[in-house]
Amino acid sequence: MQVVRQEYPEAEVLMGTSTAGIPHAAIVAQMMGLPMGYVRGSGKDHGRKNQIEGRLEPGQKVVVIEDLISTGGSVLDVVSVLREAGAEVLGVASIFTYGMQKGLSRLAKANVKNRSLTNFDVIAAVAAEQKYIQPEDVARLIRFRDNPEDESWIGGEK
């Protein structure tokens, strides 16, 4: 809630991403006294065939609530749907980001501000400090984050 208040004080509506962002958006919206909705990955195949659920008026200032950002693809799809509906998307608030270069670049190119509660570097450092993972595991995870298409990190090769 603090991130949304501080980074997006003019927010009028919170929109969760389907499915994992919905409960987080609901909680934050309730705490802030804001309306909330969510965006499906695609329109329903019955009823009104809505992709956006919840009341959204053209021109309203929206913050998208997401659980995790990796490459940015799914959250950018949501932003696109909202913009097409006439919303002014102020940005995205997520719980976690890997900080993958591909995701950061895509968000920047789409002019989408992103604020996360935590990130890969913090989680990896705390996990290593608390001895949940070993230093070599951190190195492997960094290789994944920096180049997810290269699966050599899985086998533990250095």
Residue locations for each model-derived region?
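Active-site-facing substrate-recognition patch
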Residues: M1-E10
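Nucleotide/phosphate-binding catalytic cleft detector across ATP-hydrolyzing
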Residues: E7, Q30, R145
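Short glycine-rich phosphate-binding loop at a beta-alpha junction
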Residues: P9-S18, A93
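Portal/gating segments that form or line small-molecule/metal binding sites
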Residues: I22
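Short, glycine/charge-rich flexible loops or terminal/linker lids adjacent to PRPP-binding catalytic cores
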Residues: A25-V63, T71-D77
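A contiguous pocket-lining binding segment that forms or flanks enzyme active sites
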Residues: R55-G99
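PRPP-dependent phosphoribosyltransferase catalytic core
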Residues: S80-K158
